[in-house]
């Protein structure tokens, strides 16, 4: 069946990237996203939710620097075994890994930082982009990218960033001034869980 696009209420952005090396560090994303959202709202007035389906390209790199985190979460596989994705072929093992991997990713998004000289910024470049444009880390998707690259980078996990229109400016200001990460209550609880 064909979906009546006039009834659409959610727009999902997939694979937003800042590809030009010379533009790294230049925040054109906020302007671009706001313009696209305005255009979409004009063309599809019922749209009221704007989110992304985004990769976490440096999750496995971070775990490689902190391998003890796997044992702390009860994950018995080594980082390279997780990155191979072979475990996903065993449905029972995949079910066992679902919650610990989601918790690992929530911890990563909430607390993995790198210093830029002034403030500690998220280790993940995609997270820096979306948080720097006022998004909120909303949810995690297990087995969302089962490509070899998806397993190699993030064990098959992907993340949704939500652009809540009435929160964008507040989130952006808090992130820019203090490095505060806007995150859904569900993910924040998951990140704190021990």
Model-derived segments and their meaning:
Residues 1-194:
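Extended, composition-driven regions rather than compact fold-specific motifs
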């Amino acid at each position: 069946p064909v979906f009546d696009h006039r009834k659409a209420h959610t727009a999902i952005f997939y694979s937003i990237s800042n590809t030009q090396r010379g533009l790294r560090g230049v925040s054109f994303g906020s302007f671009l996203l706001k313009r696209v959202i305005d255009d979409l709202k004009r063309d599809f007035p019922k749209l009221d939710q704007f989110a992304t389906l985004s990769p976490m390209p440096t999750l496995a790199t971070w775990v490689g620097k902190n391998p003890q985190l796997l044992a702390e979460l009860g994950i018995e596989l080594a980082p390279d075994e997780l990155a191979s994705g072979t475990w996903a072929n065993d449905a029972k093992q995949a079910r066992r890994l679902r919650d610990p991997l989601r918790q690992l990713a929530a911890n990563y998004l909430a607390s993995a930082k790198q210093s830029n000289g002034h403030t500690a910024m998220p280790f993940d470049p995609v997270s820096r982009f979306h948080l720097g444009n006022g998004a909120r880390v909303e949810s995690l998707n297990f087995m969302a990218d089962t490509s070899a690259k998806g397993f190699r980078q993030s064990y098959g996990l992907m993340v949704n960033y939500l652009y809540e229109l009435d929160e964008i400016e507040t989130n952006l200001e808090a992130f820019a001034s203090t490095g505060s990460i806007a995150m859904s209550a569900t993910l924040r609880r998951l990140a704190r869980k021990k």
